[in-house]
Amino acid sequence: MTTKRIDRDLPSSDDPSSAKRRIEFPEETLENDGAAAIKLLSLLLQCAEYVATDHLREASTLLSEISEICSPFGSSPERVVAYFAQALQTRVISSYLSGACSPLSEKPLTVVQSQKIFSALQTYNSVSPLIKFSHFTANQAIFQALDGEDSVHIIDLDVMQGLQWPALFHILASRPRKLRSIRITGFGSSSDLLASTGRRLADFASSLNLPFEFHPIEGIIGNLIDPSQLATRQGEAVVVHWMQHRLYDVTGNNLETLEILRRLKPNLITVVEQELSYDDGGSFLGRFVEALHYYSALFDALGDGLGEESGERFTVEQIVLGTEIRNIVAHGGGRRKRMKWKEELSRVGFRPVSLRGNPATQAGLLLGMLPWNGYTLVEENGTLRLGWKDLSLLTASAWKSQPFD
């Protein structure tokens, strides 16, 4: 992917390790919109510098200027700048109020919020391969891990509407050796929405003559007071699915989550994570710059397939991408340190399971069948990475419990 640099001198007080950051964006994205895009991005970075150094009056002035020249309905650079500017504005207001605006991740979602997010994710699934890749790759790994098993228990740490599981039901139902039972334990924020998801999955399983049970748990795994709520049974193969995102907190207490997984000793954990490596407890500017680069690629990818007038595009950008940007920029910070999950899973007794071979081949075939160009698939050290013009967006990996020596 050809990129173009935008250089800004960033204050060393915020990030002592680097007095200057070089920010690179897809050259075609910038060239299509010319000097206007470069000016917008430069203004946004200047505003981020002001916020990082608590020059809030200057930041507010610059945000007013930015709001006059960019729109969430314009070009891809305009749109991404508009959402990052909104997030900076939220952070500025929070700073004026002495932190009165608490992180969204600490607030349970209302039913209405959940429904809006789930609906927007369904739309995203119809206009982009990212969610399809997540579901398909994890399902292939799970199917392989369940070879020879006839009693299955899947623990989905964020089941949402359960969109992933009908495809797995299909391939499990096609096996010569029929399942004696398949259970899904699904975590979620609303008992009503969980019940609705359970009914849909039960109806689908029934249509395939699969013996199915759904076990809803309202809440998040890291806050589980009694791990026996997971209700594992003797002789069943246990799989944990963990799709990470930044729409809301999925796991709660990181250390408790790891301890529960360690004690659970599942046959397999499938993890799909965004390729954002910043540390929430570190530099604000570091978090801002990496997020700006990452989400610029996502906006560019959507813009490549959908026009500026597309209602689907606006829905995804506003409810999915805009919410994640706000959580990273306006609410992210030192309250909670992001784990490096690869290292942490290894530390508590898990080893990676390679996704090369059939999962990689099947993922490549899926990507080739979809109508979107510009996406790339790379197998690296047994993981699968989906990218946009060579910038990694999602990484899928699988893990297996192993005893300590």
From Swiss-Prot:
GO biological process: bundle sheath cell fate specification; endodermal cell fate specification; leaf development; regulation of DNA-templated transcription
Region named SAW: 330-400
Region (Leucine repeat I (LRI)): 38-102
Locus of motif LxCxE motif: 45-49
UniProt keyword Oxidoreductase present: no
Keywords: Nucleus, Transcription, Transcription regulation
Stretches for region VHIID: 121-186
Molecular functions (GO terms): DNA-binding transcription factor activity; transcription cis-regulatory region binding
Subcellular location(s) of the protein: Nucleus
Reported tissue expression: Expressed in seedlings, cotyledons, shoot apex, leaves and flowers.
Residue ranges annotated for the GRAS domain, each copy included: 31-400
Principal subcellular localisation of the protein: nucleus
Positions of the UniProt region annotated as Disordered: 1-20
Domain of life assignment: Eukaryota
Spans annotated as Leucine repeat II (LRII): 196-228
InterPro entries in UniProt: TF_GRAS
Record motif VHIID, residues: 152-156
GO cellular component: nucleus
Residue span of region PFYRE: 238-327
Described function: Probable transcription factor involved in plant development.
UniProt xrefs under PANTHER family: OSJNBA0084A10.13 PROTEIN-RELATED (PTHR31636)
Subunit structure as annotated in this protein's UniProt entry: Interacts with SHR.
Official protein name in the record: Scarecrow-like protein 23
Lineage: Eukaryota, Viridiplantae, Streptophyta, Embryophyta, Tracheophyta
